[in-house]
A protein has these predicted regions:
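A glycine-rich helix N-cap at a beta->alpha junction
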Residues: 73-94, 178
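RNA substrate-binding interface of SAM-dependent RNA methyltransferases
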Residues: 109-180
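Boundary-proximal intrinsically disordered activation/regulatory segments immediately upstream
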Residues: 1-69, 156-157
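Glycine-rich phosphate-binding loops that contact phosphosugars or nucleotide phosphates
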Residues: 103
Length: 180
């Protein structure tokens, strides 16, 4: 892999999306177009990639370059992979990485309610669920219950927030959803 970049300076601008940009700022990163989100853990990243989301960069704990992350990284030889030891990454991000890997990805335009509801028979409707952990758990349950789609009111937390996507184990990328 020739796209590995050792992190020696955690203040470089390329790492801002991982360390110094809030979830809300990521959401609005390219306004008025869809912004960014951070996927955490190889399983969640793999599901996002399989759903067609575009990676911008990866942040990987050095010891995990040869672990679960390796197969994902080999598929994207031109995408930058920033890496450092555990202590450096925790100091930069403020938390331990789940399974040692993060990925900055571009959001996509959300489908309309009409597009979501077309050819569906089982839809979960979420009203004002503000906790990202709860959003993730509900999406995971919706997947287990074979829901065709999820509709969220504008008062709901974003399913692509890092914690919501991680708790859902990536099912937010497998079940169609939108706000109404």
């Amino acid at each position: 892999m020739n796209n590995i970049i050792e992190i020696n300076d955690i203040t470089v601008p390329e790492l801002d999306v991982y360390a110094r940009t809030s979830e809300v700022q990521l959401l609005r990163y390219y306004e008025p177009k869809p912004g960014l989100f951070i996927a955490e853990s190889p399983k969640v990243i793999e599901r996002a990639l399989n759903a067609g989301y575009e990676p911008l960069s990866f942040l990987v704990e050095h010891k995990d370059l040869e672990g679960e992350a390796k197969q994902i990284l080999e598929r994207y030889p031109k995408i930058p992979v920033y890496t450092a030891e555990y202590d450096v990454l925790v100091g930069m991000t403020g938390y331990a990485l789940a399974r040692g890997m993060l990925c900055a990805m571009k959001r996509r335009r959300l489908p309309s309610v009409e597009e979501i509801c077309q050819n569906t028979s089982r839809i979960a409707i979420l009203e004002n669920v503000v906790n990202p952990t709860n959003i993730g758990a509900i999406f995971r349950s919706a997947a287990a219950l074979h829901m065709d789609a999820v509709l969220l009111t504008s008062g709901c937390s974003d399913p692509l927030y890092r914690r919501a996507a991680r708790v859902s184990m990536g099912t937010v990328f497998q079940i169609p959803w939108t706000y109404f």
